[in-house]
Every structure is written in structure tokens, then in C-alpha cells.
């Protein structure tokens, strides 16, 4: 039985799983087949536990499909497979694989200042907030992959996920994860040189270096860190000199296996005003989206925040707030802080009626902004169709998919029941609305385009 069995499994898993999941969890695995046992080697315990928990049934099912009763036993281990296996497979692959053109890349010459006399030890401004850790980051379906990727980077900086690019709307937890990674790296190695900053700080530092004729010191500082964490990379847009310098810094860090993590409010290729060569490099490692939190995650965030403040928040109150404030975590926490402050000032118990009063203007604004009519108008404009098409009986995909999207958004962003949503879409049955919601949820898992459409529309409607 040859190791091509695992290659067959990989091919099927790549077809069946979303690309991000496959790249994050399956691709790093190494395999060794011996004595009717398939050993899968994971780079660390975190990956091993995740794969065994999430994909064990998938892998066993494929082994049974390919081998029937002769399927090998499956064993998981942390580490790498024996070197002899790697050499053997490399030789086999080189013989069996079709020849491909060999591209040789010249090693970049080291900057002249590298050959100068030893420089004084640099002092690093970490700027990592110790309050933001993985332990106090509330995980949900909307951010699960992003948290898992960040955790892996913290455990193995400079490894497979370099760079790590996190993107999503404002207030969804990207910055929290950046700090959590920084804290994780420094917890494992106390003297690690970890630098967190907003992209504008990089620009400001470069401008000062140019003004003070200290650009070589600037380069040495940024190219000698162990991990560079840059928030809101989209602010590099149209800053050509900054992009040029960051391009070379990026290359130097990657060459040195130093970790880079970037965040943005949009997918790399959608960042206008940034050079294509930079956008291409942003996607070299792993790119993960953070979605707006679903209801259960919003409730969990409120409960955890209340607990941190030693406040007892009744479950029904948390659900009341979470159902009405949906756009981002920052808005949720701000609303809860307001409720807590009002309760402390007045000495009153936190009830639904009290919350209605404390958040009166915020709730009124939210209800005014997000209506089914507004959703229909926004979706129609986004997909360049007519509102009448959404209400019609037409079933062509160019109309049906936007209609399903609008129904799913109505369920997510309003307090209307399924029958009420159905009535607003040409008198459709509530089961049609339920099917639309489930279909969009499924497509968000499978299609990057649908996921992006949903996030863009949520952002537009919640702004």
C-alpha cells in the first residue's frame, strides 16, 4: 500500500473543505504509512487536537471509501515524519511528477549597512497591550478560524502562516487578536522582539527617519524584530514611499523567518491605492476573515464583559441587547458600559425595561437604520437589480440569490419573524425564508464571494 493513499485523501479533502480550512489544518500534516497504520504528524498539539476533533470522521470515511475493509488504522502524533520517508517521497515525486521549468531566484544582496561596524543594541517599543489575550477573546463561529490561526502563530511564529492576514469590519476583534499573538509569543520567549503598531505609525517613523537622515537605523529597527504586527494596513494606500520601504521590510522579514501579521478592513486584493506586488505578498501566507458576531457570540461577549466588571447580567437582558445591536463587538461593549454606568449611578437593577431606557436613543437609531425596506433597497443596489425583482416570482439565479441574501439579512438584522419577512418579500411562506437563510449560511462556508457579499452588506447596513 503506497503513500499515494494519503495523496488521494488530500485531493478529496481539498475539494470538500473551504480553502482556508484546508490550508490551515490539512495542508500542514505529514503522513507516514507503515504496517497498515497511517500516521499523521501535526506541527503542534493545537493542530493535532483540532484535526482529530473536527476532521477525524472525514479522514476515516475517505480511508474506508478508498480501501474498504483493508483501510489502515489512523494515528496522530506531534512532530515530523522520519527523514528517510521525506527523502524517499521527494525522490519518488521527482521521478513521477512531470517536469516543470525551474525558476532560480538570486539571493538578495545584503544592505551595505549590514557590513558596517557592530551597531548598538536597539531598544524596542513593544506596544502590546497585556490585557488582550486569547483567554479573554470570546470565540464564536464568526471568528473561530481567525482565533485558531492567531493561536498557531503565537505557538509557532515564522512558521507556515507567514504572513497572517486578518480582515473584517471595524470592531470585530482584529486588534485584540494582534495583541493576543504578541502576548503569546512573549509568554513563550520573554526576550522576543515583538512590535505592534498602527500602519500610520510606520509611516510617521519613516518620515522622521528621512527628516533626520536616519533611514538606515529605521531599516535596522524594523528588519530585526521577531514579530511585526501592523494594524489597518489599508492606510498605506497612496503612500508610495512608505509602500516601497514596507515592501523591502516585508521581504527581509520573510527571508529571516520573522513573523508578520497584518489586519485590514477588506480583502487584500480589494485595498485600493496599494501596489499589486504588495497585495500579492499579503496573500502569501494565510488570509482569514472575521465576520460580524452571530447572536450567540454577541450574548457570550456581553456576559463575559459583565462578569469582568463583577456585574450580574440576566440572560434575558443580554439576549435583548444582543438582538438589537449586531454590527460589532465595540458597539456591544460600549452599550453595556453605558448600562452598567447608569445602573451604578441610579442604584437600579438591570432589567429589560431599564435597558430600554438607558439605551433609548441607540436602540431607536438602530431600528430606524435597519428595516426590511432598507435591506431590499441596499441589496438591489448592490446586485444591480430592481427591488421589484426581489418581490417577484422570478427564479433565475441572478434574482434568486440576491433575494435569498436579502431574506437572510432581514433575519439577521431585524426583529421580524420569518412569516413577517416572507410577507415583505411578495407574500412568501416562512419555510421559504428559512430555506433562504440556511442556503446563505451554507454558501458563506463554501464560497468566498458569498461570504464577502454578506460581510459587505452587513457593513453597509450597520454603518
Swiss-Prot record:
Stretch list, region Domain I, interacts with DnaA modulators: 1-90
Subcellular compartments: Cytoplasm
SUPFAM superfamilies per record: P-loop containing nucleoside triphosphate hydrolases (SSF52540), TrpR-like (SSF48295)
Statement: the UniProt record of this protein carries the keyword Transcription regulation: no
Job description of the protein: Plays an essential role in the initiation and regulation of chromosomal replication. ATP-DnaA binds to the origin of replication (oriC) to initiate formation of the DNA replication initiation complex once per cell cycle. Binds the DnaA box (a 9 base pair repeat at the origin) and separates the double-stranded (ds)DNA. Forms a right-handed helical filament on oriC DNA; dsDNA binds to the exterior of the filament while single-stranded (ss)DNA is stabiized in the filament's interior.
UniProt family annotation: Belongs to the DnaA family.
Name the record gives this protein: Chromosomal replication initiator protein DnaA
Taxonomic source organism: Serratia proteamaculans (strain 568)
Primary gene name: dnaA
